[in-house]
């Protein structure tokens, strides 16, 4: 008896004109996620997903490459205008925003949504180098 063939569903490309770019920049990595206005993911990328390993993930260049990759994928799905929300203290914040603009997306607004603790958990100890 022959094995049944399973039909793979093709991924339907969404056509969204405007959306939100969420840039999460940590000390170790930079993640760029582009969503529609409701929050459904359209495209994403990160420095680690592009092959950067270790301390190279935390560089501004890695953040720039991650933003370019996510922007290219979003532009392929018809995105033109984005709002940018940046979270975290990492070094890739500015370069990721510049890369989104250079890729051809029109930035309408930039928000900093970094969470600020009202004296929450204890921070990591100071480094002694």
UniProtKB/Swiss-Prot annotation:
Checking Gene3D superfamilies in the record gives: Ribosomal protein S11 (3.30.420.80)
Q: Which GO terms describe its cellular component?
A: ribonucleoprotein complex; ribosome
**Gene Ontology annotations of biological process type:** translation
Keyword line: Ribonucleoprotein, Ribosomal protein, RNA-binding, rRNA-binding
Give the transmembrane region(s): none
Task: Give any GO molecular function from the UniProt entry.
Answer: structural constituent of ribosome
Q: What Pfam families does UniProt report for this protein, alphabetically?
A: Ribosomal_S11
Query: What InterPro entries does its record include?
Result: Ribosomal_uS11 (IPR001971), Ribosomal_uS11_bac-type (IPR019981), Ribosomal_uS11_CS (IPR018102), Ribosomal_uS11_sf (IPR036967)
Q: Quote the PROSITE patterns the UniProt record gives.
A: RIBOSOMAL_S11
Q: How does it assemble?
A: Part of the 30S ribosomal subunit. Interacts with proteins S7 and S18. Binds to IF-3.
Function noted in UniProt: Located on the platform of the 30S subunit, it bridges several disparate RNA helices of the 16S rRNA. Forms part of the Shine-Dalgarno cleft in the 70S ribosome.
Q: Indicate the family of this protein.
A: Belongs to the universal ribosomal protein uS11 family.
Task: Return the protein name.
Answer: Small ribosomal subunit protein uS11
Q: Which organism is it from?
A: Lactobacillus delbrueckii subsp. bulgaricus (strain ATCC 11842 / DSM 20081 / BCRC 10696 / JCM 1002 / NBRC 13953 / NCIMB 11778 / NCTC 12712 / WDCM 00102 / Lb 14)
Tell me the name of the encoding gene. rpsK
């Amino acid at each position: 008896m022959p094995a049944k063939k399973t039909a793979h569903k093709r991924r339907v490309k969404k056509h969204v004109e405007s959306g939100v770019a969420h840039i999460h920049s940590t000390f170790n990595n930079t993640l760029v996620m582009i969503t529609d206005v409701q929050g459904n993911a359209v495209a994403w990328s990160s420095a680690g997903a592009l092959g950067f390993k270790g301390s190279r993930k935390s560089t501004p260049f890695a953040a720039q490459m991650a933003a370019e990759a996510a922007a290219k994928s979003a532009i392929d799905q018809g995105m033109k205008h984005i709002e940018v929300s940046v979270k975290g203290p990492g070094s890739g914040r500015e370069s990721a925003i510049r890369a989104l603009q250079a890729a051809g997306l029109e930035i309408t607004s930039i928000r900093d949504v970094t969470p600020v603790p009202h004296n929450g958990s204890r921070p990591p100890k100071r480094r002694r180098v």
